[in-house]
């Protein structure tokens, strides 16, 4: 490590220790609440999708969901001229489903030569933080859309999409409301298909699988980029004019499926789509669970950051969403 780089890194460690009221950042410590919130905000800001959903800090590792759903409509009328009385309705969905935040490790390293290349940059400390924040955001998306289990010892080789790190949103829906999940549907113009096109599939799923009191403007289709590409690629290919191609490419970003706004999100399964209000998806982090430890490892010519936090992926109300997967 270059002498100037060493000086920058030591200042970084000193600042981390100062903010967290510890003597030494190279000894494992619990992150201060205010710093913890800033770290979580930095992660969220690096991903457009993560800025659209809920990020909630909870006190307990396990407990009741924070938001409440509704289990029916509430508008009505009662003729009280006789013996009948007006009756209130409980708007809270009664559910035994609880959240549980699992410890997740985000351990990274940066080699000395990379740090040396940053030594003349005034934002040296910000670069150190940003490198980790970006990858944590990517991992959260990958877990949210692909996670199916919580393994004591995760295996990145057999689970390249982090399927064994935590239980993601799609798996939560499969486990807790299987009736809101369709699979194996065929889409196309041939006679043996279930739907003539993706629009028909989305329209049917929204009206058949989601409770009617959630049929409002907040419903969004979350899809893999392949579904969007399959629908509009032939249009782009048929247009050689740059202006027309740009217009069509822009259309793919904000297009409607079945009359609903649609967004393509990285790491979402290519053969699936989910319909839900974005406010129905949450990531819970247990307050005070973030721990940090920095190690200067000359044996490997790198610095290492060991970060962990307790987190979970929550669907607030299963009645407000559905999943169509395994599309053929």
Language-model segments: residues:
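Sequence/fold signature of self-assembling virion shell proteins
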Residues: 2-47, 164-186, 193, 228-328
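Signature of extracytoplasmic/envelope-associated structural regions
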Residues: 3, 7, 18, 52, ...
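Hydrophobic, Leu/Ile/Phe/Ala-enriched alpha-helical segments that form helix-helix packing faces
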Residues: 16, 136, 140, 205-213
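Short glycine-rich, low-complexity/disordered patches
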Residues: 22-35, 142-154, 215-222, 245-248
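Assembly/oligomerization interface modules of large self-assembling protein complexes
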Residues: 26-109, 161-165
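Alpha-helical scaffold segments that mediate packing/assembly in large oligomeric complexes
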Residues: 105, 112-201
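Ordered core of a single globular domain
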Residues: 191-238
């Amino acid at each position: 490590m270059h002498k100037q780089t060493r000086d920058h890194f030591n200042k970084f460690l000193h600042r981390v220790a100062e903010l967290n009221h510890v003597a030494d950042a190279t000894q494992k410590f619990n992150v201060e609440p205010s710093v913890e919130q800033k770290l979580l905000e930095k992660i969220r800001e690096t991903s457009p999708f993560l800025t659209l959903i809920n990020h909630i800090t909870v006190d307990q590792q396990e407990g009741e969901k924070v938001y409440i759903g509704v289990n029916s409509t509430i508008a009505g009328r009662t003729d009280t001229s006789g013996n009948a009385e007006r009756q209130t309705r409980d708007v809270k969905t009664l559910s035994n489903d609880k959240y549980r935040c699992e410890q997740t490790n985000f351990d990274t390293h940066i080699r000395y030569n990379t740090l040396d290349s940053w030594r003349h940059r005034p934002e040296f400390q910000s670069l150190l933080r940003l490198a980790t924040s970006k990858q944590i955001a990517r991992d959260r998306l990958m877990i949210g859309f692909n996670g199916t289990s919580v393994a004591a010892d995760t295996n990145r080789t057999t689970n390249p999409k982090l399927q064994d790190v935590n239980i993601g949103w799609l798996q939560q829906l499969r486990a807790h409301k299987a009736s809101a999940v369709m699979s194996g549907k065929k889409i196309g113009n041939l006679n043996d298909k279930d739907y003539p096109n993706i629009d028909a599939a989305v329209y049917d799923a929204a009206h058949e699988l989601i409770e009617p009191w959630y049929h409002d403007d907040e419903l969004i289709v979350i899809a893999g980029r392949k579904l969007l590409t399959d629908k509009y690629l032939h249009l782009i290919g048929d247009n050689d004019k740059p202006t027309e191609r740009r217009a069509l490419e822009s259309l793919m970003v904000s297009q409607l499926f079945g009359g609903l706004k649609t967004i393509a999100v990285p790491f979402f399964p290519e053969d699936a789509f989910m319909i839900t209000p974005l406010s129905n998806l949450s990531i819970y982090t247990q307050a005070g669970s973030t721990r940090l430890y920095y190690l200067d490892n000359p044996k490997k010519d790198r610095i290492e950051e060991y970060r962990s936090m307790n987190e979970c992926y929550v669907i607030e109300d299963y009645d407000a969403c559905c999943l169509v997967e395994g599309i053929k």
